[in-house]
C-alpha cells in the first residue's frame, strides 16, 4: 500500500510540475510570442557539400559541433563499434596538439568539449563563449582531421569501451532499444 501511495505521489508531483509550466503562459498569445522569438535556423551548404546549420540567439555563449551520419546503424560484423571507438580516440591529441595541450587550450577558453555516439550519428561539439566560436571550430576541425591513434591510447580506450559495452548489455532498457 505504501508503495502504491508513493507511486501516486510521484505521479502527482510530475503532473503538478507540468501544470506550473503551463501556468507560466497566461494565454495562447503568450505561447505564440515565445515560439516566435525562437531564432530561425539557417542551413547553408559549402562548396565541398558540408551542410552548416546556424542560429543567432544573440546569447553570449554558443555551441558548435559536427554531426556525422555514422552511428552504430551503419556498422556491420567487420567494423562493429568503430564509430564509438573513434569518438573515444578523438581527444587523445592531434598532429598539432598533445592531449594535455588540447585540454589546457579548451580549459583556458572556459569551453567544454565533448562527443557522443548514437545509432544514427557521431557528434563532436564544443560549448564556448560566442567570441571564441572561431577558435572552437578550429579545434574541432583539428580533432576531426588530425587525431593521432597511438598504440597505448588504443589499448587503454579498448578496455574502456569493453567495460562500457558490458554496462550496456546488463541494462535491459539499453538492450531492448538497441
Q: What residues fall within each predicted segment?
A:
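His/Glu-rich zincin catalytic helix
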Residues: 2-101, 125-128, 138
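Acidic/histidine-enriched segments that form metal/cofactor-coordinating
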Residues: 17-25, 29, 94-95, 99-178
Amino acid at each position: 500500500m505504501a508503495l502504491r501511495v508513493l507511486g501516486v505521489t510521484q505521479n502527482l508531483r510530475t503532473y503538478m510540475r507540468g501544470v506550473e509550466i503551463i501556468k507560466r503562459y497566461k494565454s495562447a498569445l503568450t505561447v505564440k510570442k515565445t515560439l516566435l522569438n525562437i531564432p530561425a535556423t539557417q542551413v547553408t551548404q559549402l562548396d565541398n557539400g558540408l551542410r552548416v546549420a546556424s542560429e543567432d540567439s544573440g546569447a553570449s555563449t554558443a555551441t558548435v559541433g559536427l554531426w556525422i551520419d555514422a552511428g552504430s546503424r551503419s556498422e556491420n560484423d567487420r567494423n562493429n563499434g568503430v564509430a564509438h571507438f573513434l569518438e573515444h580516440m578523438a581527444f587523445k591529441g592531434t598532429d598539432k596538439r598533445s592531449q594535455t595541450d588540447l585540454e589546457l587550450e579548451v580549459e583556458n577558453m572556459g569551453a567544454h568539449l565533448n562527443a557522443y555516439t548514437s545509432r544514427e550519428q557521431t557528434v563532436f561539439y564544443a560549448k564556448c563563449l560566442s567570441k571564441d566560436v572561431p577558435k572552437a571550430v578550429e579545434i574541432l576541425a583539428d580533432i576531426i582531421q588530425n587525431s593521432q591513434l597511438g598504440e597505448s591510447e588504443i589499448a587503454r580506450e579498448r578496455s574502456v569501451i569493453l567495460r562500457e559495452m558490458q554496462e550496456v548489455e546488463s541494462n535491459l532498457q539499453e538492450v531492448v532499444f538497441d
